[in-house]
């Protein structure tokens, strides 16, 4: 019996020492890899396949070891920083504001899409109507997307408040394409939805990238029939964020490697497939102060908008 107790004691001590050794392993080693989180805004298999290419590149060019995880939601990513299960993550703007406030997470890069580091909202109305600018929406019926939609409500709401414009009635269409359809069909006087600038395709033809493109099949003449009457102020794109306890040297090496990767042909293809990203740009927390001020203006907080 005594021998059994001794054996169990030895095994227990060995287990504890092993666990402690693992916990003390330096970040970036095989025993304690840097945990990189990608939220599945597209098919998880697409992220899994392309993030492996990204992971292999980082390991080859930084000497660190990485582990890629695909959480189920932005909130899960935020809380992973609190439990130290995340070191780096691609996260949306509101998720970053929460993670920064609660856990000191740092935004070190922002994504670019077609050369733009920001995104905007737009107001649209019938091109042949009397509504030509945002100020003309006083006393009108306006469609928004959803109370928790950034480009479909929060940002355009700030635009209205800044100009002291009060519509007579507001409705929520639930989707960006529904907003455009309601304006096209005359169900509302105007609507607010996401805006991205038009770009030149491979054939040299300009293509619209705003919410109107979502109904091109249904309404081929939507670009002519529905006009943009105003744009919101620019808001910074989603950031790549880092846990604050990571060393400055480690952060610098990884940021440099990530920006180099996105500039390669395989990097461009991988990031475009994952998030429609074409480039990365260095960022700081101050870049997101405009979002904080926007939320104050409309009486919202980031936590409210992350519930949906």
Predicted regions: what is each one?
Residues 16-19:
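C-terminal motif of bacterial Sec signal peptides marking the signal peptidase cleavage site
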Residues 26-93:
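Extracytoplasmic small-molecule ligand-binding "clamshell" domains
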Residues 31-53, 59, 208, 246-308:
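An extracytoplasmic/periplasmic, membrane-proximal ligand-sensing/linker region
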Residues 35-40, 114-122, 213-244, 252-255, ...:
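Periplasmic-binding protein-like
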Residues 40, 70-74, 84-103, 111, ...:
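Beta->alpha turn/N-cap motifs
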Residues 111-165:
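A conserved helix-loop-strand patch within extracytoplasmic ligand-binding domains
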